[in-house]
Amino acid sequence: IELKKEHLKDSPFIGNQVCAACHPKSTAVWKKSRHASAFATLENLEKHFDPECLECHVVGFNPWDASESSSEAVRKFEGKRGFLSLNLTPHLTNVQCENCHGPAGNHLANSKIKPAEHNPASVCVECHQGSHSPLFEFEKYWQKIKH
């Protein structure tokens, strides 16, 4: 339990419930998306302990350093402390606001600090690529989560 308190204090990730307080319309769109149940997908496949799967299905899971060739969308998480486990950080399960918009702790502390602007297509393909998402078409799926 102490680890959780320390982690929460130091983590730049706040979770979607905090975002929802000020961004209810975006949250409503998210709740209808498959992103909102991404962790359950892993549990159903018994992959909820696989680091390669967790990297995209939870917020801020990055037990390794981003490579120099990684995109800015991936490198924004480098050195950040996000999801640890279902027991310790349940508020960071699923694909949430901070997966795409980056850590929001600074924004929560000061609303003048805005999340970094990113090209949505480049952020999406960090997870939706290759064998992980062979049928992914940005234009088709963007319409389902656009907010």
List the predicted regions and their residue ranges.
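Short sequence/structural segments immediately N-terminal
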Residues: 1-147
